[in-house]
Curated annotation (Swiss-Prot):
Keywords of this entry: Hydrolase, Magnesium, Metal-binding
Protein's UniProt name: Putative hydrolase Bamb_4846
Binding-site list for Mg(2+): 124, 126, 155
The species this protein was found in: Burkholderia ambifaria (strain ATCC BAA-244 / DSM 16087 / CCUG 44356 / LMG 19182 / AMMD)
InterPro entries the UniProt entry points to: FAH, Fumarylacetoacetase-like_C, Fumarylacetoacetase_C_sf
KW Iron-sulfur (keyword) present: no
Length: 282
């Protein structure tokens, strides 16, 4: 299934794509794509519904983040060896874990706000993993059983706040609008191997990032198992799994960063695309 949330910010309704790619309203069956609705049992109930019997959503509504009430938004850094190289950092021996504040979450086509005074706002196309079942201390072999599905994430980052000012990465990762998620939550049964997905990103039509999840340092299963040893993962938690090379700060000889008035387009095979315009934060 391709599940989504549509409508004005803060008033999103749950939906599903039908066989023709049209949005159908799910709100008579589930209040939101959050919590227990993301469990195996919850998704099984949704899967039993024929989308053709659901109300058709007219027009072109705003698409919100594909998951509601996200409890934890967990980032993984330097998870592609060639990205670590372009960043001038060693390939990690353990996952680099940081937090993205849930207040950064927005829809896949909402605008990106360039923070006041920022000259180093950067892009990162990433595979997002949405937890469906509570898990703690799970084995790698069973880790994917706890996943509800997958989505596209743009891990927007302000490099001065992330790196140059010292301290933790979190503060450069969590500005408002720095977490576009979606458009769809694609359930795990439709993604047989999350380590075989092409992902890409363009700015103003120029392709900067081209990668495949097979080159991750730590696989999705390894990340879920690892994170479950140091925290309880809960339904609706989102793990954004790192980015391939081609970020702005790694461009030689001179880094390239986002400015107001630009267009960012990114996607992952089978998971949909995002399209964002950049603007100065007010």
């Amino acid at each position: 299934m391709k599940l989504l949330r549509y409508g004005p910010s803060g008033q999103e309704k749950p939906g599903i794509l039908d066989a023709n790619g049209r949005i159908r309203d799910l709100s008579a069956h589930v209040p939101d794509l959050a919590g227990d609705a993301l469990s195996d049992a919850g998704l099984t109930r949704l899967r039993a519904i024929d989308p053709a019997t659901l109300p058709l959503v007219s027009g072109e509504p705003r698409i919100g983040a594909c998951v509601g009430r996200v409890g934890k938004f967990i980032g993984i850094g330097l998870n592609y060896a060639d990205h670590a190289a372009e960043a001038g950092m060693p390939v990690p021996k353990e996952p680099v874990v940081f937090g993205k504040w849930t207040s950064s979450i927005c829809g896949p086509n909402d605008g990106i706000d360039i923070p006041k005074g920022s000259v180093k706002t950067d892009w990162e196309v990433e595979l997002g993993v949405v937890i469906g079942t509570t898990c703690k201390d799970v084995d790698e072999a069973r880790a994917l059983d706890y996943v509800a599905g997958y989505c596209v994430v743009n891990d927007v980052s302000e490099r001065e706040w992330q790196i140059e000012r010292g301290g933790q990465w979190d503060k450069g990762k969590g500005f408002d609008t720095f977490g576009p998620i979606g458009p769809w939550l694609v359930t795990r049964d439709e993604v047989p191997d999350p380590q075989r997905l092409d992902l890409w990103l363009e700015v103003d039509g120029h392709r900067y990032q081209n990668g495949n999840t097979r080159t991750m340092v730590f696989t999705v299963a390894q990340l879920v198992a690892y994170l479950s040893t140091c925290m309880t993962l809960q339904p609706g938690d989102v793990i954004t799994t790192g980015t391939p090379p081609g970020v702005g700060m790694g461009i030689k000889p001179s880094p390239v960063f986002l400015k107001a008035g630009q267009t960012v387009r990114l996607g992952i095979d089978g998971l949909g695309e995002q399209l964002q315009s950049t603007r100065n934060a007010r």
